Structure formats: C-alpha cells, structure tokens
C-alpha cells in the first residue's frame, strides 16, 4: 500500500487493471459472500483488494526495468541459468532465453550469436589444421615431389651428363700451384696436386663442358703460363693457356646394345611385315632351276702399317712440284704469290690507297671488307709510301674476333 500512495498516477492504472481479478474472485465465491455478514464481507473485500494491488504493483515494477535495463537482466539470466541448470545444453538455454525475452530480441540475438560463434569457431579452425598436420592429400604429395625434383636441379643434371673429364698439368716447378680460368669465371683458384713420381709436376682433373676454356696458373703467388700447353692472348693482350674440350665419341658396342633394346621395345609387326620377314628366311633353292641371287662383293685389301715416309715429305724437289701444282690449280695459273709484295697486304686494299695490283684482285676486294691482317702488325703504326703528295698512316686494333683499322691521310707540301 505504501508504494501505491507515493505514485498516484500508477494507482489509477493499477485499479483499472485489477478490477477484473476482483470481480473474478467475487464471482468465484458467491456462496460465501451471501452467507457472511456485512462486516465479514468488508474485511474479505479489503484483503482481496490489498492482495490484488500488491500483485499489480509487483507486475508493474517487474515491467519497468525490462525496458530500461534489458542488458543487465539478460546477463543475470545467463548467470543464473549457468549456475542453477548446469546440466542443460547451451543451445536449449539460448532458445529459452529468446522465447522468454521477446521485448529485447534484437540485442539478445546478437549477443547470443556472438557467444555461439566464440564457442564453435575454434573447433572449425582447429579441425583443418589437425587434418593437414596428420594427413595430406595425394595431390599435395605429388606437388611436393615435383617441387623436390625441381629443387634438386634438372638443368644441373643435364649439364653434368654433358661434362667431360679433363686433366690439367703443370710441369715447370713450384711449391704451390693453382689454376683459374673461364670455367671458374676467373674468381676461384683450384689447387693442383703434386705428382709423387715427378718432382715439380702438378696435376688436377676437372669436369668441363665441351668448348674452348682459357686459364692461367698461379705458381707461388705469380701468374704464369705453361709452355707445354697451347697459348693465346686475351682481350687485354695477356698470354693465357687454352684447351678445347670435345664430346667423347659414341661407343659402337653401346649403340648396338641400345638398338637391340629399342627393337625389343617396338610394338608387334603387322601381317605384311611378318610375311616379308618369313620370305627372307626361305632357302635359296626355289626348285625348277630357280635360286636366289647373291652379289659377291670383292673383299677389301688388308691394310698394314708401315714406317716408310712418302717421298713427298722428304724429297724437296717432289715437295716443290707437288705444292706448285696445287697452287697452280687453286690460283688458275696466277704466279703473283711467288713475288713478295711491295707493301703489307692491308695497305694494298682499295680502301687504303686506291691501288690495284691486278684486275683479279679488284674483283676479289670489291666488297669493301679488309682481309684478316697478320698478328705482327696489331697495335703498330704502319705507313705507306708518299703518293700524290699524301702520306697514309694506319693502325689496326683487334677486339675479340673483329679487327678495326684506323687510317689517317696527311697532305705533304712539295718543297
């Protein structure tokens, strides 16, 4: 009763709402109301009104905080359900909470969805990791094997099959000998092993690709070139040794074995080819005077080795006649090569001094390209004779396999 007096506006609402239960209570007990006295009826009606007002005030108090503090109520219900009903599953708890709290459905659904997601997402994330760590599909295993084969080096295996073993030897003394060259890109030094039988001799075996390789020796911290190996010059004019590596010749026995293996792997022949093979195996005598014809090949004369040197290599007269006839056939009776030239060959070209020795030479040099000069004139100053009051000075420089000729024409005043 104290709560209703402090809020007169709520009293009116509660009285209006509570008329129905009062009438219902009175209707339910008509016999008692008729049999009791007026004083007893008044006391009973007062008690009934007090009970109804208390019920309405409790329901009104319970309805107001549902709108103001829905979140706090929800938290309390979750905590009470977790403590009071530990045996109930989480899914059923969430469903009952949604059914009971119809006023705050939007906020409660979001919070409940977050809770369910938090409990279920780790399981979903953990299952593929466990599967990947424990088991892998055959497709992934095949990809891993292919990657391992690629990492092992497919091109390197091809190169190793083409490499040829080569022995490099140094025979000019020294205590420590190393070799470096184009096969190491001039960056690494490979130590040579001394020979136990021969003092001052070193050797090493390398596997190199076919081609030309240049190298130099480092003997006691000094760059040197072997006199027992072919020598050439590099781009800077320094002497280097070189070696030409060739692919080994194929062994005929191995080829025969491979051909037999290839024949064994061939598919079965057709009917016609099998008949042809059977005809080849038939006897030579066909009857009635017909026989198979076999051509008798003349045997080759046996060859023998001899120590006699032919006269063309020992007799000077025979050698001179032999080379003279060869040159005559090649030059078509041109004997100009027998006389020495007045100038070096590079200065007799059309580009240099407009001079032609013969008409044939003009026809040969009409392309405008100079012939390959001799190596002794490289990096030298060459001059020609003064013609028409003009002096010609030239120099030739080589870069790899190209030759560059620079010509300077200087006029000379006649005194």
Curated annotation (Swiss-Prot):
Compositionally biased tracts (Basic residues): 9-19
Protein name, per record: SNF1 protein kinase subunit beta-2
Polar residues: compositionally biased ranges: 55-69
Protein family (similarity comment): Belongs to the 5'-AMP-activated protein kinase beta subunit family.
Bias type Basic and acidic residues, positions: 122-150, 249-264
Induction: Induced upon shift to nonfermentable carbon sources.
The protein's role, per its UniProt record: Beta subunit of the SNF1 kinase complex, which is required for transcriptional, metabolic, and developmental adaptations in response to glucose limitation. Has a structural role, mediating heterotrimer formation, and a regulatory role, defining carbon source-regulated subcellular location and substrate specificity of the SNF1 kinase complex. Involved in the regulation of aging. Acts as a negative regulator of nuclear SNF1 activity in young cells by sequestering its activating gamma subunit at the plasma membrane.
Protein's cellular compartments: Cytoplasm; Cell membrane
Other observations noted: Present with 300 molecules/cell in log phase SD medium.
Pfam families: AMPK1_CBM, AMPKBI
Any GO molecular function: enzyme-substrate adaptor activity
Main localization category: cytoplasm
Gene Ontology biological process terms from the UniProt entry: cellular response to glucose starvation; filamentous growth; invasive growth in response to glucose limitation; regulation of cellular response to glucose starvation; regulation of protein-containing complex assembly; signal transduction
Region (Kinase-interacting sequence (KIS)): 154-335
Residues that bear Phosphoserine: 66, 298
Region (Association with SNF1 kinase complex (ASC) domain): 336-415
SUPFAM superfamilies reported in the protein's UniProt record: AMPKBI-like, E set domains
Assembly: Component of the SNF1 kinase complex, a heterotrimeric complex composed of the catalytic alpha subunit SNF1, one of the three related beta subunits SIP1, SIP2 or GAL83, and the regulatory gamma subunit SNF4. The beta subunit serves as a bridge between the catalytic and the regulatory subunit. Interacts (via KIS domain) with SNF1. Interacts (via ASC domain) with SNF4.
Cellular component GO terms, alphabetical: cytoplasm; nucleotide-activated protein kinase complex; nucleus; plasma membrane
Keyword terms, alphabetized: Cell membrane, Cytoplasm, Lipoprotein, Membrane, Myristate, Phosphoprotein
Organism expressing this protein natively: Saccharomyces cerevisiae (strain ATCC 204508 / S288c)
Stretches the record annotates as Disordered: 1-43, 55-158, 249-276
Membrane topology (UniProt): Peripheral membrane protein
Lipidation, N-myristoyl glycine type: 2
Post-translational modification as stated in the protein's UniProt record: Phosphorylated by SNF1 in vitro.
Lineage: Eukaryota, Fungi, Dikarya, Ascomycota, Saccharomycotina
């Amino acid at each position: 009763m104290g709560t209703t007096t402090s809020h007169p506006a709520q009293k009116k609402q509660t009285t209006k709402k509570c008329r129905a239960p009062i009438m219902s209570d009175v209707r339910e007990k008509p016999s008692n109301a008729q049999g009791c006295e007026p004083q007893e009826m008044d006391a009973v009606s007062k008690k009934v009104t007090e009970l109804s007002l208390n019920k309405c005030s409790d329901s009104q108090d319970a309805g107001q905080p549902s709108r103001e503090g829905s979140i706090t109520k929800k938290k309390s219900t979750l905590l009470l359900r977790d403590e009071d009903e530990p045996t109930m599953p989480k899914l059923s708890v969430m469903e009952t909470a949604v059914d009971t709290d119809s006023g705050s459905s939007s906020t409660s659904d979001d919070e409940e969805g977050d809770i369910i997601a938090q409990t279920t997402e780790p399981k979903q994330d953990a299952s593929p990791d466990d599967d990947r760590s424990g088991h892998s599909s055959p497709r992934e295993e095949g990809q891993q094997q292919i990657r391992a084969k690629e990492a092992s080096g497919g091109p390197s295996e091809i190169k190793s099959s083409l490499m040829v073993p080569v022995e490099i030897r140094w025979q000019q003394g020294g205590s420590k000998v190393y070799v470096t060259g184009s096969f190491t890109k001039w960056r690494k030094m490979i130590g040579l092993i001394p020979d136990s039988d021969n003092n001052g001799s070193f050797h090493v075996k390398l596997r190199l690709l076919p081609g030309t390789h240049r190298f130099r020796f480092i003997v006691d911290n000094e760059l040197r070139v072997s006199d027992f190996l072919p020598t050439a010059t590099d781009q800077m004019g320094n002497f280097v040794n070189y070696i030409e590596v060739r692919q080994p010749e194929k062994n005929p026995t191995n080829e025969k074995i491979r051909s037999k293996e290839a024949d064994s792997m061939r598919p079965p022949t057709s009917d016609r080819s099998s008949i042809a093979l059977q005809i080849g195996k038939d006897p030579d005598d066909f009857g009635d005077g017909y026989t198979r014809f076999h051509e008798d090949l003349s045997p080759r004369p046996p060859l023998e080795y001899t120590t006699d040197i032919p006269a063309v290599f020992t007799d000077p007269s025979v050698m001179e006649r032999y080379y003279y006839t060869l040159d005559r056939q090649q030059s078509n009776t041109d004997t100009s090569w027998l006389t020495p030239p007045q100038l070096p060959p590079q200065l007799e070209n059309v580009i240099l001094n407009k001079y032609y020795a013969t008409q044939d030479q003009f026809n040969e040099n009409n392309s405008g390209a100079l012939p390959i000069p001799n190596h002794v004139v490289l990096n030298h100053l060459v001059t020609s004779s003064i013609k028409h009051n003009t002096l010609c000075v030239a120099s030739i420089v080589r870069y790899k396999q190209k030759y560059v000729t620079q010509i300077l024409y200087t006029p000379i005043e006649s005194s």
